[in-house]
Amino acid sequence: MKRAYSPKDIAAKKWVTLPWGEKWNKPFGFPAENASWFISGASASGKSSFVMQLSKELCKYGLVLYLSYEEGVNQTFQRRMEYLKMNEVQGKFRVVVDETYEELIDRLKKPKSPKFIIVDSYQVSEWEYPDAVALMKRFPKKCFIWISQDCLLYTSPS
């Protein structure tokens, strides 16, 4: 039987949190460094710009790997990087456009591997939900940020 936590057990847990400033702690508090995020929104709603700003902030706390499966490194991606001055985090920010699930695992097993992994987008990665869960369990000290487009579910009339 799995352990059941009491309120006292939960209150006693300690977390290593991101010590970021007011701009980020007001809306998000101080999340655990190894928290997993799921960011979802409609197409063209500003997700990519927000996530690029978040990436830049996360570079203060460790290496960031941005898996740009949806956009690649197209002109829009390039302009966004220029606009947000991502050159200021040179050496802390890397972009990959076509890495497989297995290649990502190999990368994350290395000693100086990224601390923050952004998957943009979950749908385009073509990973199954169990793959994502297995990745987070295998690398529990890393932060995974999953970007998703809103999807409409259609149920045929009965």
Describe each model-derived feature in a short phrase.
Residues 154-158:
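Conserved small/polar residues in nucleotide/adenosyl-binding loops
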Residues 1-11:
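Charged, amphipathic alpha-helical linker segments immediately N-terminal to NTP-binding catalytic cores
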Residues 38-98:
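Conserved P-loop
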Residues 127-139:
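Conserved Walker B catalytic segment
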Residues 32-37:
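Pre-Walker A (Motif I) flank of P-loop NTPase domains
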Residues 142-150:
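Structural recognition of the conserved hydrophobic beta-strand(s) that form the central parallel beta-sheet
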Residues 17-31:
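Pre-Walker A adenine-sensing motif
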Residues 113-126:
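Conserved P-loop NTPase "ATPase switch" module shared by AAA+ and STAND
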